[in-house]
């Protein structure tokens, strides 16, 4: 094989030189290679003439001879020059002989072709003696690379129990050698570990070799794949690991963890409440576990049911009806666990462990008494005196068979109409009237009794419905109140009123009422219409109002009950004055007909009078308050506190907390005596101990004011009960365009003591206070 490679290399170089000679003509440089033959004839132009060839990774000493360029220019001053990216770095040329040399070992996998340009230039002038010629140096491949996998580890999965030949994964390895050279880049694969389960073809496809790959036996396989080229070259990096995971399928039956399950439950367990749990083992993965539990045999399928917990795959046994220890103390039956989604074609065999026996022991508990019926319905005719209505019966279901005591809940018999005996007999204590209550709903309690007759244990209740039957004990009466009227000049046969009757008793399907007048000697007659109504008409005509303004007619009404009852209802017929058209013009019963009596009219009049008096008082009070506000000062006249003056003078007597003398002393530096009336009145604010007054010559006025303010501030801070001095003050401000400008004391500076405020006395009584505050003090003038 190596000889063939060398021969192919020499042949390629020879053909390249021939092509160069053919294209260059007589004056173009010629490229020569080792073993080049003399050319006596022009070669065809389709030969590749501009190529040189060299083997990669040559073991000979550097530099390596690549080829030779020649020219028919025979000049002593000619030299050969190479140009290109790799000229002078990797390749060089002998300037005199034209030999092209490689100064580095070449690697075809890095660079497979080098592009160079050959020139013949003058040694002295470096001018081209011929046109430049480009040529290519191709690196011949040698089999110096082994195949390398794209990944060191491949991950794949395949369903368990797959058929033989099922594709798993395709692995890929790449050989960097020249694929055009036979055998250099051809990749071959083989499994060196795990080949008893899987196979691989020359394309790198791995497939199953056997069909019984069971995930429950081995869930994952580690396969080692090795690759080499066609010439058998392999290396360390030509090995890869393939991790093949078996995907689970539902091919296993659930198996009970026990062959027998025993549970003990109280007999009073609630229907539908879990009484036990069944556990199975299913080697399949959770998504393939769908266990279904069922009772195989026995007559208890209607007593118990088994549900599946989807999260834990457990069976939950629940009772479907109440358990009774006194009837059955133990239940035994067989159960089966199946999987409806199992893949039977992959199922090897059934182990028989998917069946088990269940035993349920019922425990006795103290149960409440049990009534023989769910409810009782008794009937009793009304007006009966303490008869036996009915009997309720309850028994102790336990083995103790204790005696039972009965009682009626007071909340169901608030009127205490009934009583019950120890034997459960129910009697009525009072006569029952169906027209008052037609039904009675009683709640009867049953308790177990100990040997002393005291209730013990649990209790049970039952509803007793007592229906009161009707008896014909109510005579018929008018269906509504009638107030008939008749004209005093009514003619004979004039209809006065049509009456009908009603009965409080249960009315039969076809009730029949009979009507009759008790006294036939009146001026009225009764005509029975035979439809449970009757007409009252004038018998003779002409009534005398002066003799009788009202006529009272007793009417007898009889029913068709057994026995028949007759009632008497009285009609009061008023005689009225009428006009010619027969319209009533005056009736004494009009006031009564309106439904308003004399007492009611008096009460209404008193209410109206009371409301009127209250309204007048409210209006008067608002008027007085409005007048009081009209005489009071507005909010703009408030200074330090609200002072209300009901008269022109004397208002300053209320300002005990506002010491006017202090302000005057500041202005004049003298002490103004307090009025005796101010000392007699109690102070509104906390009394402040003032500092001793200093003469104006010893201390300035404004300084004394500052001291006074500090003292008041300190005492106000220490007095938790007194009102604060730093409250909001509202001052009236007349404006800069007025004569007095601002009246606020805050706008007064310390140098206003020379201002004459006597003009305030001319402003009237409302400014008297300001005139006294800012007016000159005679004592100050004396001191000055």
Curated annotation (Swiss-Prot):
Signal peptide as annotated in the record: 1-24
GO molecular function: beta-catenin binding; BMP receptor binding; calcium ion binding; cell-cell adhesion mediator activity; fibrinogen binding; protein phosphatase binding; protein tyrosine kinase binding; signaling receptor complex adaptor activity
Membrane topology: Single-pass type I membrane protein
Domain Cadherin: 46-149, 150-256, 257-371, 372-476, 477-593
Carbohydrate-modified residues: 59, 155, 441, 523, 535
Induction: Up-regulated by SOX7.
Binding residue positions for Ca(2+) 3: 143, 145, 175, 177, 184, 229
Binding-site list for Ca(2+) 1: 56-57, 107, 109, 144
Entry GO terms, CC: adherens junction; bicellular tight junction; cell junction; cell periphery; cell-cell junction; cytoplasm; external side of plasma membrane; nuclear membrane
Assembly description: Part of a complex composed of AMOTL2, MAGI1 and CDH5, within the complex AMOTL2 acts as a scaffold protein for the interaction of MAGI1 with CDH5. The complex is required for coupling actin fibers to cell junctions in endothelial cells. Within the complex AMOTL2 (via its N-terminus) interacts with CDH5. Interacts (via cadherin 5 domain) with PTPRB. Interacts with TRPC4. Interacts with KRIT1. Interacts with PARD3. Interacts with RTN4 (isoform B).
Protein name: Cadherin-5
Species of the source: Mus musculus
């Amino acid at each position: 094989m190596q000889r063939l490679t060398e021969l192919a290399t020499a042949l390629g170089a020879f053909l390249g030189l021939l092509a160069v000679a053919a294209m260059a003509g007589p004056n173009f440089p010629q490229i020569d290679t080792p073993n080049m033959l003399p050319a006596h004839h022009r070669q065809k132009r389709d030969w590749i003439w501009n190529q040189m060839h060299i083997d990669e990774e040559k073991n000979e000493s550097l530099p390596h001879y690549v080829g030779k360029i020649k020219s028919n220019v025979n000049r002593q001053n000619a030299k050969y020059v190479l140009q290109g990216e790799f000229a002078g770095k990797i390749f060089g040329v002998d300037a005199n002989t034209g030999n092209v040399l490689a100064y580095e070992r070449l690697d075809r996998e890095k660079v497979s072709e080098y592009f160079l340009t050959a020139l013949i230039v003058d040694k002295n002038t470096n001018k081209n003696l011929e046109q430049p010629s480009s040529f290519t140096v191709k690196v011949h491949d040698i089999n110096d690379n082994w195949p390398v996998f794209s990944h060191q580890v491949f991950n794949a999965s395949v369903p368990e129990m797959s058929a033989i030949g099922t594709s798993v994964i395709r692995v890929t390895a790449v050989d960097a050698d020249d694929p055009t050279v036979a055998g250099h880049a051809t990749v071959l694969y083989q499994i060196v570990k795990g080949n008893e389960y899987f196979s691989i073809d020359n394309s790198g496809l791995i497939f199953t070799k056997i069909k019984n790959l069971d995930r429950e036996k081995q869930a994952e396989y580690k396969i080692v794949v090795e690759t080499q080229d066609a010439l058998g070259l392999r290396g360390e990096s030509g090995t890869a690991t393939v991790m093949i995971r078996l995907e689970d399928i539902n091919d296993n039956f659930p198996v009970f963890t026990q062959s027998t399950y025993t549970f003990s439950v109280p007999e009073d367990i609630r229907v539908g409440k879990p009484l036990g749990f069944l556990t199975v083992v299913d080697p399949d993965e959770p998504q393939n576990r769908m266990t279904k539990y069922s009772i195989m045999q026995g007559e208890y399928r209607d007593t118990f049911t088994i549900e599946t917990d989807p999260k834990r795959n457990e069976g939950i046994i629940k009772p479907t009806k109440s358990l009774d220890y006194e009837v059955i103390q133990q239940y035994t039956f067989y159960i089966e666990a199946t999987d409806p989604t199992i893949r039977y074609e992959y199922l090897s065999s059934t182990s028989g462990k998917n069946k088990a026996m269940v035993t349920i022991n019922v425990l006795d508990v103290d149960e409440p008494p049990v009534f023989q019926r769910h409810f009782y319905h008794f009937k009793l005719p009304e007006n009966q005196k303490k008869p036996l209505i009915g009997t309720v019966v309850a028994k102790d279901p336990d083995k103790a068979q204790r005696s039972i005591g009965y009682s009626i809940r007071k909340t169901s018999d608030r009127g205490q109409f009934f009583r019950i005996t120890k034997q459960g007999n129910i009697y009525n204590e009072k006569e029952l009237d169906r027209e008052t209550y037609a039904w009675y709903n009683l709640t009867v309690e049953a308790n177990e009794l100990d040997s002393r007759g005291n209730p013990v244990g649990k209790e049970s209740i039952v509803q007793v419905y007592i229906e009161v039957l009707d008896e014909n004990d109510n005579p018929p009466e008018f269906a509504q109140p009638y107030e008939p009227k008749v004209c005093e000049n009514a003619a004979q046969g004039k209809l006065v009123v049509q009456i009908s009757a009603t009965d409080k008793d249960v009315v039969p399907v076809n009730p029949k009422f009979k009507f009759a007048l008790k006294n036939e000697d009146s001026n009225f007659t009764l005509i029975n219409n035979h439809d449970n109504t009757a007409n009252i008409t004038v018998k003779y005509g002409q009534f005398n109002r002066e003799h009788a303004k009202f006529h009272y007619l007793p009417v007898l009404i009889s029913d068709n009950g057994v026995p028949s009852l007759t009632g008497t209802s009285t009609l009061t017929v008023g005689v009225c004055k009428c006009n010619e058209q027969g319209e009533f013009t005056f009736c004494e019963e009009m006031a009564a007909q309106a439904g308003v009596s004399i007492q009611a009219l008096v009460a209404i009049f008193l209410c109206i009078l009371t409301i009127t008096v209250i309204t007048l008082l409210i209006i008067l009070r608002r008027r007085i308050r409005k007048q009081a506000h009209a005489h009071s000062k507005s909010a703009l006249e408030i200074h330090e506190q609200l002072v209300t003056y009901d008269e022109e003078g004397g208002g300053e007597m209320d300002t005990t907390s506002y010491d006017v003398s202090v302000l005057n002393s500041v202005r004049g530096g003298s002490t103004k005596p307090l009025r005796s009336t101010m000392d007699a009145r109690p102070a509104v604010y906390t009394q402040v101990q003032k500092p001793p007054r200093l003469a104006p010559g010893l201390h300035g006025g404004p300084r004394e004011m500052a001291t006074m303010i500090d003292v008041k501030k300190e005492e106000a801070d220490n007095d938790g009960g007194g009102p604060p001095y730093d409250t909001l003050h509202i001052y009236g401000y007349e404006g800069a365009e007025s004569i007095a400008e601002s009246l606020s004391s805050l706008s007064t500076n310390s140098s206003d003591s020379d201002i004459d405020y006597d003009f305030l006395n001319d402003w009237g009584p409302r400014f008297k206070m300001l005139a006294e505050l800012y007016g000159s003090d005679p004592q100050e003038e004396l001191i000055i």
